[in-house]
Amino acid sequence: MSSDIQQIRIGLTNNHPCSYLADRMERVAVAIDPQMQTPETYEVLMANGFRRSGDTIYKPHCDHCQSCQALRIPAPDFVPSKSQKRLLKLLSQEFHWQLKPELDEDWYALYARYIFARHRHGSMYPPNKMEFAKFARAKWLNTQYLHLYQGEKLVAIAVTDLLPNSASAFYTFYDPDISISLGTLAVLCQLNYCQQTKKQWLYLGYQIDECPAMNYKVRFNPHQRLVNQRWRG
């Protein structure tokens, strides 16, 4: 970290029930200096375990839990597994993707179906256009929407932050009625983008081993986890 970033002011939230582990309490550290809100600085902060929600930059700071570990993939070194190779073959045959600065007009119907089917008991329920916009956008970042199509049909959107030397998989939603792993396919598209544009890293957010819904992340290899402020893997 640079000396400027070492001196950032941090605010701590109160403890509240964890969104992922039912028996835990969570608390986050929030970077409260507006000058931290630049793509270059945020990229350094991500390398030190921070993420964003809207314009807010934060990092888990729980009293008795270290389960959240930032995870990233070195894009040039990625080697797909057998199942990922099958998805890549499908991608070349049936699907195509496109990065766009704005959402397609029919995005909300897809998003609402996804939330109703997969996250009815989560913090995003009930789906709301304005709340999603506040959550997904940051005024100071180049955020793009990776649209995944099956033929002409929109089947997934991956909100993707573009940084100078990396990309960040921020949030993905998809058609809940399609049986193939659209979430994994979206990450493969993001890795494809990183390789095309010679970006070093794709950040996948936090990995929590006790949370089965997150286990898809560790299937991308090689990957690194931030453990005790050191990237390992």
UniProtKB/Swiss-Prot annotation:
For this record, the Gene Ontology CC terms, alphabetical, are:
cytoplasm
What reaction(s) does this enzyme catalyze?
A: N-terminal L-glutamyl-[protein] + L-leucyl-tRNA(Leu) = N-terminal L-leucyl-L-glutamyl-[protein] + tRNA(Leu) + H(+); N-terminal L-aspartyl-[protein] + L-leucyl-tRNA(Leu) = N-terminal L-leucyl-L-aspartyl-[protein] + tRNA(Leu) + H(+)
Subcellular location, record wording: Cytoplasm
Which biological processes are named by the entry's GO terms? ubiquitin-dependent protein catabolic process via the N-end rule pathway
Pfam families given for it? ATE_C (PF04377), ATE_N (PF04376)
Q: What class of enzyme is it?
A: transferase
Q: Which UniProt keywords apply?
A: Acyltransferase, Cytoplasm, Transferase
| Any GO MF annotation of the entry | leucyl-tRNA--protein transferase activity
* InterPro entries registered for this protein in UniProt: Acyl_CoA_acyltransferase, Asp_Glu_LeuTrfase, N-end_Aminoacyl_Trfase, N-end_Aminoacyl_Trfase_C, N-end_Aminoacyl_Trfase_N
Q: What is its main location?
A: cytoplasm
EC numbers on record: 2.3.2.29
What function does the entry list? Functions in the N-end rule pathway of protein degradation where it conjugates Leu from its aminoacyl-tRNA to the N-termini of proteins containing an N-terminal aspartate or glutamate.
Q: Which family does it belong to?
A: Belongs to the R-transferase family. Bpt subfamily.
Matching NCBIfam families? PRK01305.1-3, PRK01305.2-2, PRK01305.2-3
Protein's name according to its UniProt entry: Aspartate/glutamate leucyltransferase
* Organism per entry: Vibrio cholerae serotype O1 (strain ATCC 39541 / Classical Ogawa 395 / O395)
